[in-house]
């Protein structure tokens, strides 16, 4: 359990696919590395025992087996010489090497006695060694005492100006802060530790910190990023002589592989690691490897093996007093027993887990444990007790969210805790508490957007000098990356790009926790929501879960929860199959009808309405509802206007909040970017788009083919609106990032981008619109998500006529985090984006019709619907891949008043 650490605010949680090489390049800096490894030895007095010097070196390398042997020998020699100081120092090192082998109370008592010795009170180096041992030993059972020990280590190291021990203390404090639910402080501490280790080329510490962050990322459901960290740690460990066996890195990698659908690879790693722990007599590490083996077995569907591993880990942990490991192993066992219907065994294990939790301050995992107990009570039919436990879990989750340092960590926390919201919703639905069920799900949905709609945004002028310098370096690296296709050069640039990303730190930060709490948006009241709905409008808010999924139906008069005829797994599998057929340019009528029956068929209000506002869940974020076919064989598009929103709360704010000043300019369009290659032929359009979306940030790179239809698309849109004196077109050499940013963006009602787009679900901040680059500017030509959120807009509409611009990283019940959401954060009322790779010529025709209908006074959602109908009327029943990629997210209910 102690391996789990939250990623840092400065985005050390986002690495390139080649991140392992970032740190390996440090091996070339031999002088720095040598200095880092010898710093501890040089800091000791000249008459220090040679054994202690070597033991300290091995200890810093986490090679505690060999270090312990040397500390024991040094202790004997010091006793023979009568050197009390070295005797105490060696004893502290020996005690640290015995973690898991000796009684914790006995070891703690011996350490307390040493620390009370006058020699230890006056010798900072000796005291650091003993306090570090105390902190390591007591972290499992007495985190408060461990925290005080590491805080004193930090203070002493600052007095000695010892950067190595300062960084190590901050990393250990981060672990304890995270377990206590203080995610913002934990993020800051770990960021500082990792930055320091990178600057000093402290390779052993990078192995430790990289493993910690990687395991934390697995906890947050970000396995792809976690794998990069752990690969880096393992590569470094393999290159550093005498380093201890990196158990946490192997555990991290195996868990990440299991999450990524590769459990067999993970199991192979863990079996080797388990043998190593037993050979080295490391019971704490053995218990954690057993837990990881259980997780991998569960991911592979072998639930019997999973429970055996968890139970074995629990027995080993109880025998050795590993409190966190008891809680972790029994929690995992309880989940598996619950899923196979063995509720008595599940409750037995979770009761043991909760008893262990009460002995330590692990606020981060508390909501998850409470949710398991709540789910068990619900399955037993005790809905009142289940609701009480879910309420406790929700309160504990809110405490964590109140401490989150930025909107991405907030989103990741919500994603991790999604089962809490879904389970609580299901219980409220079964109890008939519709308003309460709505409040529960709306607490999570679109949370970061709802919060930031009311929170002041950090503006460019408020960046520190260091942040501005880091941003300039970042842009230079991206410009260079865009120019080269050499794999070796790109690999090096991607590594450097990651390091520059970590120094950017441009995310919005609240002034203080108290102020931030007052700015957090509460879920909208149902009565208030109904006041902003149109007479013919119904909101469909979906909750996908097993065994039952739900649709919360809201119109101006009432709200009702409808149980859908399938669970989340069946709906998600059908959706994935349907989308695969769509992207293959097929009609997929059978699945289109099945999804209609599952998602819309039970909604009895449907025939009485003409406008649907969809609040999606899970895979439904990728599904264009308008392509489904009803009982009459017609598309939903033919009977209903469809738009989408992150949540009902966000929808309410978008319809009620007004910009400080109404925009005076009608249209800003950017297109005809002079990319480097001419297209080969029109049949390759979608393949070209797919290659671009995939290739900007990989080793091979991607060529940017010009989009010949984009010029006429932008010109046609502007002409359709017929406001030439209130429009600005940025075409050809003027279609640059710097030109775009130089415009008074807050003064435009419509922003239109006809450009290439880059989707990056693994690294969402890298998602970008690819504009031109002015050689006189420092901009890189990539308008990235992180930059978009810092814009100040008042636009009624942003149109992203580029591939995959309505996609992003799915953050559980929070929703999608991508380009469309970034523009909503920046102040746009609505965003039109694409769910897949779009056809250049088809897009031109659709957009021309869209703007024509806008100019005629139709509301935004209706104008987009009519443009799609026009396309079908002209070309017949073409597959949805051509006409359905564009969806409207946000408020599409009103026309744009020019």
Locations of regions flagged by a protein language model:
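Residue signature of alpha-solenoid helical repeat architecture, marking inter-repeat boundaries
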Residues: 45-46, 85-87, 125, 164, ...
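Catalytic cores of nucleophile-dependent amide-cleaving enzymes
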Residues: 749-849
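Residue register of alpha-helical TPR repeats
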Residues: 49-50, 89, 129, 168, ...
């Amino acid at each position: 359990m102690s391996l789990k650490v939250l990623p840092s605010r400065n985005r050390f949680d986002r690495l390139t696919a080649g991140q392992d090489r970032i740190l390996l390049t440090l091996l070339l800096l031999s002088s720095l590395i040598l200095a880092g490894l010898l710093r501890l030895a040089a800091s000791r007095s000249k008459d220090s025992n040679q054994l202690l010097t070597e033991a300290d070196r091995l200890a810093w390398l986490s090679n505690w087996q060999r270090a312990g042997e040397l500390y024991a020998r040094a202790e004997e020699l010091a006793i023979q010489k009568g050197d009390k100081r070295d005797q105490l120092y060696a004893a502290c090192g020996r005690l640290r090497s015995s973690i898991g082998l000796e009684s914790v109370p006995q070891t703690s008592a011996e350490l307390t006695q040493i620390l009370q010795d006058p020699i230890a009170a006056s010798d900072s180096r000796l005291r650091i060694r003993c306090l570090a041992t105390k902190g390591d030993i007591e972290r499992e059972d007495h985190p408060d005492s461990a925290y005080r020990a590491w805080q004193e280590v930090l203070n002493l190291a600052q007095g000695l100006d010892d950067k190595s021990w300062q960084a190590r203390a901050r990393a250990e404090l981060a672990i304890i802060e995270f377990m206590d639910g203080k995610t913002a402080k934990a993020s800051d501490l770990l960021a500082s530790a990792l930055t320091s280790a990178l600057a000093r080329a402290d390779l052993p510490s990078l192995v430790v910190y990289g493993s910690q962050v990687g395991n934390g990322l697995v906890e947050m459901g970000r396995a792809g990023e976690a794998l990069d960290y752990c690969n880096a740690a393992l590569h470094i460990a393999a290159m550093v002589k005498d380093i201890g066996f990196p158990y946490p890195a192997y555990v991290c990698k195996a868990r990440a592989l299991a999450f990524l659908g590769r459990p067999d690879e993970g199991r192979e790693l863990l079996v080797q690691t388990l043998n190593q722990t037993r050979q080295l007599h490391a019971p704490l590490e053995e218990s954690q490897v057993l837990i990881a083996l259980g997780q991998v077995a569960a991911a592979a569907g072998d639930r019997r093996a999973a429970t055996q591993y968890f139970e074995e880990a629990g027995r080993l942990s109880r025998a050795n007093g590993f409190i966190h490991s008891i809680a972790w192993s029994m929690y995992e066992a309880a989940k598996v027993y619950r899923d196979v219907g063995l509720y008595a065994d599940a409750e037995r294990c979770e009761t043991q887990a909760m008893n262990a939790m009460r002995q330590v301050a692990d606020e981060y995992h508390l909501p998850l444990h409470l949710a398991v107990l709540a789910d068990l009570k619900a399955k037993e039919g005790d809905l009142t007790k289940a609701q009480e436990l879910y309420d406790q879990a929700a309160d504990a989750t809110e405490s964590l969210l109140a401490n989150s340092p930025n909107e991405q960590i907030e989103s990741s926390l919500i994603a991790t805790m999604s089962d809490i919201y879904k389970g609580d919703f299901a219980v409220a639905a079964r109890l008939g508490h519709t308003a309460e069920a709505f409040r529960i799900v709306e607490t999570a949905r679109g949370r970061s957007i709802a919060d930031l709609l009311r929170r002041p945004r950090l503006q460019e002028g408020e960046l520190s000098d260091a942040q501005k310098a880091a941003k300039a370096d970042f842009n230079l690296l991206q410009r260079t990356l865009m120019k080269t296709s050499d794999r070796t050069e790109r690999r090096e640039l991607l590594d450097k790009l990651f390091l520059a990303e970590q120094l950017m730190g441009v995310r919005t930060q609240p002034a203080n926790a108290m102020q931030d709490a007052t700015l957090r948006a509460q879920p909208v009241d149902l009565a208030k929501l109904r006041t902003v709905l149109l007479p013919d409008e119904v909101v469909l808010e979906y909750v996908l879960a097993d065994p039952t999924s739900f649709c919360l139906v809201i119109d101006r008069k009432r709200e009702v929860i409808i149980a859908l005829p399938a669970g989340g797994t069946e709906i998600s599998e059908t959706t994935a199959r349907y989308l695969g057929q769509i992207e293959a340019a097929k009609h997929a009528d059978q699945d289109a009808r099945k999804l209609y029956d599952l998602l819309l068929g039970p909604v009895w209000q449907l025939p009485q309405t003409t406008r649907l506002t969809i609040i999606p869940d899970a895979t439904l974020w990728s599904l264009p509802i308008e392509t489904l076919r009803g009982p009459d064989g017609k598309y939903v598009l033919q009977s209903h206007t469809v738009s989408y929103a992150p949540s009902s709360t966000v929808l309410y704010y978008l319809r009620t909040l007004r910009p400080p000043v109404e925009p005076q300019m009608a249209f800003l369009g950017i297109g005809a970017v002079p990319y480097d290659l001419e297209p080969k032929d029109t049949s390759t359009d979608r393949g070209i788009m797919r290659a671009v979306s995939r290739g900007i940030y990989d080793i091979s790179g991607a060529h940017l083919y010009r989009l010949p239809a984009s010029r006429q698309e932008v010109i046609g849109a502007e002409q359709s609106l017929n406001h030439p004196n209130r429009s600005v077109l940025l075409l050809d050499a003027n279609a640059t990032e710097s030109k775009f940013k130089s415009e008074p963006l807050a003064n435009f009602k419509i922003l239109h981008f006809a450009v290439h787009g880059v989707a990056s679900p693994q690294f969402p901040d890298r998602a970008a619109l690819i504009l031109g680059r002015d050689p006189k500017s420092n901009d890189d030509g990539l308008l990235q998500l992180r930059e978009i959120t810092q814009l100040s807009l008042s636009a009624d509409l942003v149109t992203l006529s580029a591939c995959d611009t309505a996609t992003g990283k799915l953050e559980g019940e929070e929703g999608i985090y991508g380009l469309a959401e970034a523009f909503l954060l920046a102040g746009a009322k609505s965003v039109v984006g694409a769910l897949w790779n779009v056809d250049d010529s088809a897009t031109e025709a659709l957009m021309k019709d869209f703007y024509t209908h806008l100019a005629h006074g139709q509301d935004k959602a209706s104008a987009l619907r009519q443009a799609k109908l026009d396309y079908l009327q002209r070309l017949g029943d073409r597959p949805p891949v051509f006409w359905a990629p564009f969806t409207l997210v946000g408020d599409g209910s009103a026309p744009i008043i020019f």
